[in-house]
Amino acid sequence: MIGGLFIYNHKGEVLISRVYRDDIGRNAVDAFRVNVIHARQQVRSPVTNIARTSFFHVKRSNIWLAAVTKQNVNAAMVFEFLYKMCDVMTAYFGKISEENIKNNFVLIYELLDEILDFGYPQNSETGALKTFITQQGIKSQTKEEQSQITSQVTGQIGWRREGIKYRRNELFLDVLESVNLLMSPQGQVLSAHVSGRVVMKSYLSGMPECKFGMNDKIVIEKQGKGTADETGKSGKQSIAIDDCTFHQCVRLSKFDSERSISFIPPDGEFELMRYRTTKDIILPFRVIPLVREVGRTKLEVKVVIKSNFKPSLLAQKIEVRIPTPLNTSGVQVICMKGKAKYKASENAIVWKIKRMAGMKESQISAEIELLPTNDKKKWARPPISMNFEVPFAPSGLKVRYLKVFEPKLNYSDHDVIKWVRYIGRSGIYETRC
């Protein structure tokens, strides 16, 4: 019946994904995002057919719910399920928003397991569901201090046991960021944001006190703190964060007053913080496309990529995907660097470059032969997408210091071996052509 259910935010990012049939693949997720959410013209029909796949979709606020199937199903039944799903989520955690969905993703998957059985709707009555799933949803952001009440009263640290000993004290810190971009053919940034995580691996003896400092000035836009002078400075000295969440070990009072992160770390690997920013983003690459139609049976495509970071840095795992029309019969490709190949099954030219230094550029040219067609509708020109990995944080986040103190075992910051690494990766990095 229903092959898969996907919940997207307004940018086309998948928040919830559940696949019930083997014939629904990853390409279905991308097809809906490109042809419906990012469509140049507003899609009015609630049912969209793409490559023999039907997408039944509803929109609540800025959230899209899409049921996908390749079978001939009862459309009324599918929409009944989608609206019931919206009602059930509202009953459990209130308003359907990106924040609430992220906070309650475990609950949503439990609800889907009860409501759908191999893609067939079974039980969607809220009253009946609450007898099976008694978990209460998180309706709004709660103060993180509440999660630390027990440990503050009893004096116990629930996330770390006592008596931990290591022969060598080490601390590894990774700043992992995903940069998302949608750019116009003229080079205008239509939307851009960075989602980041600070991941730490702690191999420290005893109960160490850690202090972690970032850029000289941090402005939390969501809280409305900071002044215009702070946000106007370069990304190296200041960073404007739209929202952030911390591990329960972080003392939030210190962060509010000093903008430093103080904590007793759990043993091993954990996520210290997660954040999102939309201002002063360093875009690692710019894609400049040029598509020229030569009659009705030929296209000439030229794509230039320019790296926008220090020459001493190297980007890796670079991949550019240039879409081609469905009636493509042959492609001739010439690239300055790397390797390029036309993949007919994906209707795209895939250009791969192993490494590329900063402040460099490279280009690819292609001649695309087209089969004659009676279809008068022009090619939609899907956006060119790009994947890459760079050794810096596109948000401009910098680690200023990382200090460790352990008064009981009498070892100090100088006795700890510390490693800091920055990794920036592409999320949905697209340029319209």
Curated annotation (Swiss-Prot):
Gene3D superfamilies: 3.30.450.60, Mu homology domain, subdomain B (2.60.40.1170)
Purpose of the protein: Component of the adaptor complexes which link clathrin to receptors in coated vesicles. Clathrin-associated protein complexes are believed to interact with the cytoplasmic tails of membrane proteins, leading to their selection and concentration. AP50 is a subunit of the plasma membrane adaptor. The complex binds polyphosphoinositide-containing lipids.
Record's GO cellular component terms: AP-2 adaptor complex; cytoplasmic vesicle
Binding residues annotated for a 1,2-diacyl-sn-glycero-3-phospho-(1D-myo-inositol-3,4,5-trisphosphate), in chain numbering: 339, 343, 352
Name of the protein this chain belongs to: AP-2 complex subunit mu
Intracellular or extracellular location(s): Cell membrane; Membrane, Coated pit
Primary localisation category: membrane
Keywords: Cell membrane, Coated pit, Endocytosis, Lipid-binding, Membrane, Protein transport, Transport
Domain called MHD: residue spans: 168-432
